[in-house]
């Protein structure tokens, strides 16, 4: 009888672990951030005050703000403050590369995930890390804005 209880408890625990992995909510199912220069794993923790958009981004790697007009407007303000001096107000590039063409310096930066990684962690040359200057939510809004700029050019 006692052995049966342990077997059932073990089975329940095992099913709980397997269930966690299949729902997409376990830590192992979260996005694996990578350094844009070295492709090494990059630790980007989910902040305790994360917005729903940041939580979804950490789960999927997709930007929930893409196409969101309010987020794009806020992203434009942030872009003009932090990014326009190197990438130009229209995104055409100066010190930094163009953000409105289809040429990417790093393989991963053609995705919202790769763009987030390079803004957060930095790149080569003048591209400094912005992970301590902007919140993760703000970075997602900047990406929504640059995606909007790119779509306008096509």
Please tell me what each predicted stretch does.
Residues 92, 148-154:
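Inter-heme linker and motif-flanking segments adjacent to c-type heme-binding CXXCH motifs
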């Amino acid at each position: 009888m006692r052995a049966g209880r342990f077997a059932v408890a073990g089975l329940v625990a095992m099913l709980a672990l397997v269930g966690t992995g299949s729902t997409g909510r376990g830590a192992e199912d979260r996005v694996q951030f990578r350094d844009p220069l070295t492709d090494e794993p990059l630790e980007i923790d989910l902040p305790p005050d994360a917005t729903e958009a940041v939580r979804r981004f950490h789960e999927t790697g997709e930007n929930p703000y893409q196409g969101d007009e309010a987020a794009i407007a806020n992203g434009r303000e942030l872009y003009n403050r932090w990014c326009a001096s190197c990438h130009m107000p229209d995104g055409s590039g100066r010190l930094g590369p163009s953000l409105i063409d289809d040429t990417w310096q790093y393989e991963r930066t053609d995705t919202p995930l790769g763009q987030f990684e390079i803004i957060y962690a930095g790149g080569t040359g003048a591209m400094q890390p912005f992970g301590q200057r902007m919140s993760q939510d703000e970075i997602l809004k900047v990406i929504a804005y640059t995606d909007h700029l790119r779509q306008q050019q096509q």
